[in-house]
Every structure is written in structure tokens, then in C-alpha cells.
């Protein structure tokens, strides 16, 4: 059933190291967590996010696994994980499943959350050079590298200017979010619009 639903998974080499390796593992018998890992990777790939790394390990408890897989956008990765579990369950139950809906939802998540063209090109080039990146917000604020070598960019503006710092300092919510991400204690602030909210 999995081959019929995902014929493109023939490209998954898995630990066998050859084309069709994953399907060989399924026929021999493999953990369900391993199947979920490959489904999560494949549905992202079908949605235009080429992700290829995944690992599944046992927890020591039967039927419970640690599953790790790559993603391009965190929201898409979370969606893919949940969808992969639903898809695997439908395969086990031999029930029909609307795969196209999940792929379309993943495409929409990608479009809503991915970096813009300029920032995306800079991040792609950094990755080619082996420079890690961290996305610092849902927009285009990105940290390239770590420690004393880190640089930050927002769209195409680099941290070598004061522009990014001024923009962040002018935005109270973003400032608090970045400080909190760095484990710096920040008082929570909320907007109160009614007298009842004061209580």
C-alpha cells in the first residue's frame, strides 16, 4: 500500500544504500517510527521542500520511538510529522487518505513562512559555505554563524550597520522575544483593554 501511495519513495535509499532501499526495509520488517520518518520526508519533498535527513531510534519501550527528520520550515516540519502519523495509521487500517490535501497545506505553509527571495539567497549561499543559520523571527531576521563570528541580517541589511538594532529597539515585542530567546529574564507584558482585565 505504501508503494502505491508514494511511488516516488523508490528514491529513498535508506540504510540499504540503493534505489528502493526503503521499500526493501519495509518488506523485511521495520519500525513504524521508521515508516513515519520516511513519510514525513516524502510529503515535504512532494510539497517542494527537499528534505532528506531522518533517523529513528528506539526508546526501549515497545512501539515508542524517537523520530528525527529535517525540514526547511519549522511549521511545515511539525505539520509533516502529524500528517505522517495520520497517513501511517490510514495505511495500517487500509483506509483511503487524501494525500493531496496534506501536500497542498504544506505548500501553503511554505509560502506563508519561507524567507523572501533576497534573504533566502543569502541563507542558501551561507549553507553552501558550511555556515549555520538560525531564524530569529517569523520574518526575515536571521543569524549566520555562532559566537564571535555570528552576523545578523534582516532581508539584505547586515548587522555591520546600526539599522537592525534600531529596528529591533523600536519594536518592544520583538525586543522582548529576542531577549527571552537568549534566556534573559524579561517581564511579561500584556495589553489590558477592560477594567476586568486589571484584576
What are these regions (language model features)?
Residues 1, 151-199:
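Active-site nucleotide/adenylate-binding loops and adjacent lid/helix of ATP-dependent enzymes
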Residues 1-102, 109:
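Long, compositionally biased, glycine/small-hydrophobic-enriched stretches that function as flexible linkers
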Residues 34, 149-150:
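Short amphipathic alpha-helical patches
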Residues 69-79, 85, 97-138, 157:
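Low-complexity, highly charged intrinsically disordered N-terminal segments
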Residues 97, 147-148:
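Flexible hinge/switch segments at interdomain interfaces of large molecular machines
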Residues 140-145:
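Short polybasic amphipathic segments
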Amino acid at each position: 500500500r505504501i508503494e502505491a501511495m508514494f511511488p516516488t519513495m523508490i528514491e529513498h535509499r535508506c540504510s540499504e544504500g540503493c534505489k528502493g532501499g526503503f521499500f526493501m526495509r519495509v518488506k523485511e520488517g521495520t519500525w513504524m517510527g521508521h515508516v513515519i520518518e520516511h513519510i514525513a520526508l516524502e510529503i515535504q519533498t512532494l510539497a517542494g521542500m527537499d528534505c532528506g535527513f531522518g533517523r529513528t531510534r528506539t526508546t526501549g519501550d515497545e512501539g515508542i520511538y524517537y523520530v528525527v527528520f529535517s525540514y526547511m520550515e519549522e511549521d511545515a516540519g511539525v505539520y509533516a510529522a502529524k500528517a505522517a502519523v495520520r497517513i501511517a495509521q490510514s495505511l495500517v487500517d487500509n483506509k483511503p487518505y487524501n494525500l493531496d490535501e496534506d501536500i497542498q497545506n504544506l505548500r501553503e505553509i511554505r509560502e506563508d513562512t519561507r524567507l523572501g527571495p533576497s534573504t533566502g539567497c543569502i541563507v542558501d549561499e551561507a549553507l553552501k559555505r558550511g555556515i549555520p543559520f538560525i531564524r530569529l523571527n517569523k520574518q526575515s531576521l536571521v543569524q549566520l554563524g555562532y559566537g564571535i563570528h555570528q552576523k545578523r541580517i534582516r532581508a539584505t541589511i547586515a548587522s555591520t550597520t546600526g539599522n537592525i538594532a534600531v529596528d529591533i529597539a523600536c519594536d518592544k515585542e520583538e525586543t522582548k522575544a529576542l531577549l527571552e530567546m537568549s534566556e534573559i529574564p524579561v517581564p511579561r507584558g500584556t495589553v489590558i483593554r477592560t477594567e476586568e482585565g486589571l484584576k
